Amino acid sequence: GDIYEGLLEKNAEDTKSGAGQYFTPRPLIRAMVECVQPQPGKTIADPACGTGGFFLAAYDYLAAQPALDKEQKAFLKNSTFHGNEIVAGTRRLCLMNMLLHNIGEIDGQSTISPNDALIADDGRRFDYVLANPPFGKKSSMSFTNAEGGEETDELTYNRQDFWATTSNKQLNFLQHIRSMLRTTGQAAVVLPDNVLFEGGAGETVRRKLLETTELHTVLRLPTGIFYAQGVKANVLFFDNKPARKEPWTREVWIYDYRTNIHHTLKKKPLRFEDLQDFIACYHPSSRHARKETWHETDNPEGRWRKYGLEQILARDKTSLDIFWLKDKSLADLENLPEPDDLAEEIIENIEAGLNSFREILKGLG
């Protein structure tokens, strides 16, 4: 099973525009699982499960728990994991990956659906959602026009349970993930920067998320860790809550693992050890015991800082795109990264800009 995982990662490297978009860095997945700490006998879902990375990490975490009884072991093998993957080849890779790691049965009913998770609420609710929905801002579908040529049409999902109707794929996944959770469910989701700052539907979704869930943590990720180039992403951690008038979120803790952090896929890839400080700050076993590492005078370089709900609501468009650390790369000319690292970072930033312009062009078209 581990050899197969290694081959999937190698394939992701070789096909950046192909399998790479379905492959989340395994150290990041492991850190997310360590923070969420899923419990035996609970269900775990991923509405865009790719090759099954989140399932495998959660399985390893749960299988390592001491004294699992026979029922819990059977539940872990056959009933814990539920996913969707619309790309047929990727779904097959996922099913094989899971079977090789002793999840499910070859002749059993698959818990990985080939259906588009966003089309409708199927009514099922889960204890945990761990996900990295596909990058690419717009949802679209291809069709053949009258002249026999192929066109794409912007796709919006008109769902009564969504707070906002939008063609932004990530905002739709975020709304869907919230709807998948049990009242006590927890989510950890990788999402691009636009989800944090986009106006219109983006602001509506952020406000509703702050009101109806406890959005307690945002991990800002560096560039250079994903196979899809130019991706600037974050992990949002939130707990679902029962309905009430007052907002459930009182403060959001932000860990900036982007400013002055340099990773590349080959020379300096992200390692699990790199996220140890974040996990320690997250304080998985008792979040109420968290302490800021940032201090205005004593430690202005601290990466861990909290913002009250009022501070966030007062920001333009309720933006969660928050930074406070100074970018040293411009000031510290003595300690610039290696030329090839610098070149790769420049390419990442240009790619990110180009991707934004492509989305604008699509919108104008």
Where are these regions (language model features)?
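Long recognition/docking surfaces used for binding and targeting
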Residues: 1-12
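General structural signal for alpha-helix termini and helix-helix connectors
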Residues: 13, 17, 330-331
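A conserved structural/catalytic subdomain of Rossmann-like adenosyl-cofactor enzymes
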Residues: 120-365
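Generic structural signal for individual residues within well-ordered alpha-helical segments
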Residues: 1, 29-30, 343
